[in-house]
Amino acid sequence: MWGNIVEYYHITAPATDGVFASKEPSQETMDSVDSQWKESMDDYNVMLVTIGRSSTENGTYLPGVDGVDASQDLNQTDPLGLSDDERDLINAAVEAKESNGGKVIVMLNNANAMEIDEIKNNDGVDAILEVGLPGGYGFYGVADILSGEANPSGHLTDTYAVTNANSPAAQNFGNYEWINADPTVNINAEEVEAEGIYTGYKYYETRYADTVLGQGNADATAGSSTGKAWNYDDEVSYPFGYGLSYTTFEQTLKSVDVDLANRTVTAEVDVKNTGDVAGKDVVQLYTSVPYTDYDVENKVEKSAVQLLDYEKTDMIEPGESQTVTITADAQDMASWDSICDNEAGTTGNWILDNGTYYFTVGNGAHEAVNNVLAAQDQKVDGNKDNVQTWELGDFDSSSFAVTDRKSVV
């Protein structure tokens, strides 16, 4: 009503040079409002706990303790990590569940990948549901998933790291202003992305592959969350591309055809519903390209695996199958070489190294890289039978030297 003042809790991203301050009420405060809330478990056997992080224009979360309002004293080591208020909320729900039965589901109402390893490892939490920022109407879909009216088929679009601040991108992140910059101008800062392509899964999966292959000093303590040798399982809670369903699926990569003349990679994948309820699945096609002495010498950056494309199935009934065809852009196999001559008479070109190209499908980037490593006779938990290969005999700097619109790169 007019003239009425309403206080509400709204989690927002701080300004670029600001710190994150939790605006959630403490569990003690909520108990004081309704001390009998736990009795609701007598009538309803599922408790939903929502943890949120929003986003805003010209706002960001500074990595690590530098991005947290220390005066709140909430035992928070990163703005995207849990605070004591959030831990208390989850633990209160778990305690109520243990007293009255039922289940606890934590929903992530967020715009940023959070640090949720302690939720994952909490035996009292039965499920974690990533809902993102669906808006008011989108929550009808969330309700359908929670009730079983709909079968989830989404997959993570980012790596959920144990400690965000340990990645190269976070270490390099900051608000670096020009000397004598005009503070009223919104272009008074820059950031040199020294990490190159190694952000998200391209960092975590590449470093993991290097640890398996014993190369690049990848198992050093630098960037380790434990202070010990770097270990993938200590650094990643959930990998890029990971997702769950109320049923199970089996994917089989039947064939891959690379057509450089038409700039396409075409894959056929059989998807079978091996569970008890109907559902949709997502086919993710990954490639692993040769990493040669030339690349090392010329500092060509390559990821251990690269997502080429993906496709969702139709609704598949239990026991039924569907063949999915994915046609990807072959340029996504190429790597940028900053010193290679191009057709404009300068340097900088997309290249394909000669050697073996691996293709695979999987429930996320980590499953994909393990499939490739298994095909390379490494002792990992991967399926080498779900890998197809393609050989390129000669170094190729011409296939993608001109764009599909005939412009020189």
Regions found by a protein language model. Give the residues of each.
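C-terminal non-catalytic regions of proteins with extracellular/luminal or membrane-system context
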Residues: 1-409
